[in-house]
Amino acid sequence: PRSLVMMGGPIDSRESPTAVNNLATQKPLWWFEQNVIHTVPANYPGRGRQVYPGFLQHLGFIAMNPERHVMSHWDFYQDLVKGDLDDADAHRRFYDEYNAVLDMPAEYYLDTIRVVFQEHLLPRGLWDVAGERVTPGAIRETALMTIEGELDDIAGVGQTRAAHRLCTGIPEANRVHLTAQGAGHYGIFSG
């Protein structure tokens, strides 16, 4: 059958709330608009657009686990000193990708904060897209797999698995869930 794989997504962000969830629920939407939305400067492509800048997203990622990143860079330095170029190259590859964060359109970011984290419209059965109600229970002939990271500090354990609760039309035989032990949010996507 057709299949749908959901990985590390906050389908129901009320399950196992993380620091990300708490920030989104403790601040009103206007706070995000005033504090994290910026205009792309004139000398950059996309000038004049309102965005949630990639550098702020990156700063947020680093701020969630500063000790881990400091230790990772210390280990990288030690690998270079020891001549362990394989581990040093693995560090470089990881951070080349981890640091590649793009600006997000303001409309998308703010709508995500409101719909997913503040109003929980999908799990409450109240999300409309283009004037039509989204009804996950209507999915019948598509297999569903959900994947979560045991240590995910962005989409907590249970937030993605919640898709199974919403997709009531999918037979049990066409459902599977995997919790990747020892994996965080980035880890479930990077292996």
Segments the model singles out, each with a brief description of its role:
Residues 154, 177-191:
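Catalytic histidine-centered segment of alpha/beta-hydrolase-like enzymes
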